[in-house]
């Protein structure tokens, strides 16, 4: 009997000792403060033993510094601010980030994993939660502004952000290097996605709301984005926006009249990119804009395009391509390593200028695995010009034709021109200096190949055009490309 009581005494003593040890650690603390800057006093000597902290009452920047200390030098991992009144309704700049202590070493991340913010919060300051082991946080509905790099380098951030209505800008590096969320919901109020906002994130799905105005440099660089369907409201796109996106399959740039330039490195090194919608307003494709997109098999270059930059389509998988009549400049390497190309069409009667490759000196736009014996179709009367022009002389099978995929018929050329054709304001002028003894046939086409007018002339003629653009005018056996 005494032996049984002995074992019972030992067991109860162990339970009592263990309970005192657990509760003695003060792993949870409910802090009530009555004024700004009081948190340190309320926590007392327990500050470095607290794992979960709930704060009630008014807090300010000084109180956030204490919370940072509780985590960086203590054990704090969970922070509940739901019942606080934050000064100015703003999380202060660098609220839970200390540049000197955390940025000196790349591996130093604050141990806070969960934060609950109050409903009346209106602003999160710059660098507020940067470089933290944060996994979960709420975005209050009253939130209107988020500061630069507020969540930058929060690698473990797994909450799929739902940005509240009223937020108009996502600032530079806002979610840079966040590695664990895969979907972002953007509000209709959003106007700007700034530089490097989702740089090197695992975000795969983003809605681009109507009303969005601009997307900054590298905004989705090296992300897991699958589709970039840009809204009609977009007026600005930037360099590196969609580069290094291994899972990106489709980019839609709207036909809205605002965007006339595809920036440098816009969507380069995208291993899965299969389709890009380029609007007819585009006049220039920048350096390396679509460089090394090995799955991009087809692209429709817009009528009116004048410039293609260095390496713009380097190593793409085109089987054919049509260079529009408006094209004037082909950058070095822009058609290099097209190992799948079967035919090329160039609609310009004058060969577009071919620049030297800045990396492979002495070579032009076409080289490497681009076969030089494929048919290159050019307008009738321009074959010899192409054969003699640098860059185009890479090809050995240049063929004159008046049949092009766009439907434009390119008639025969002649050096014995009887007239002068030009644009003047919104008028197209066919000037015949001397009255002709017999009528001469003329025809006017849009750049898409649509017949606008035809007839016979013996004297000068002026036609008022309904829209600006590029027109093909045939008078007798001569062809003119006119920019209105």
Report the location of each language-model feature.
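Membrane-proximal C-terminal cap and juxtamembrane stalk of leucine-rich repeat ectodomains
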Residues: 366-407
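Low-complexity, Pro/Thr/Ser/Gly/Ala-rich linker/spacer regions in secreted
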Residues: 22-28, 399-415
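Short, T/G/N/S-enriched strand-turn elements that build extracellular solenoid repeat scaffolds
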Residues: 37-46, 62-71, 90-95, 127, ...
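Consensus positions within tandem repeat domains that build extended binding/scaffold surfaces
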Residues: 95, 125-128, 147-152, 171-174, ...
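Bacterial Sec-dependent N-terminal signal peptides
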Residues: 1-27
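The feature captures the LRR N-terminal capping module
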Residues: 23-45
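C-terminal outer-membrane/trafficking sorting elements
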Residues: 409-484
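Structural signature of tandem-repeat unit edges
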Residues: 26-34, 51-59, 75-89, 102-123, ...
